[in-house]
Amino acid sequence: MKKAFSFLILVFLCGMFSARLSAELSMPHIFADHMVLQRNEAINLWGSASPKEKVTVELNGQKTSVRADASGKWNATLRPMEAGGPYTLIVKGKKERLAFDDVLLGEVWICSGQSNMEFRLHAAMNAEKEIADAENYSFLRSFNVKQEMSHRPLSDLQGEWRVCCLLYTSDAADEE
């Protein structure tokens, strides 16, 4: 019985160790389809992979490779680019590949506030006109961060990028 228990502990520990060695290639939720990256500034990208894994990032003809550190964290920087898009951001590891589509380079604004930041366009006095015009602004994007409490800094945010469109300006947006 003692040998069987020791064997199970050994198998468990080996499983934990091998899982740490083969981490999944990943990036925080802020990197996603429909994102906007700041134009005319160095573009910083980061995530995690297996320790010491080579990670290659590609965007709009630029390509750079970095190596994850011993804990699997990696950081890559692309040179500044002019406004434009849509592009596809490709991130490749040894065995995995991430692709983020409909990526724009432009102005990034960070807005924060209280309940007034959750005001929906359909409640505005000129809502019909603004909603009708919304399809003309597909280059406008928003990343709505889900409310979350934490007593320490977070390495990821829960949320998603949205294209300015009828869905985002309608009652359906209130169902989030």
Language model segments and positions:
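Extended acidic/polar, glycine-enriched regions
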Residues: 53-112
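Single conserved hydrophobic/aromatic residue that forms the stacking wall/gate
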Residues: 168-176
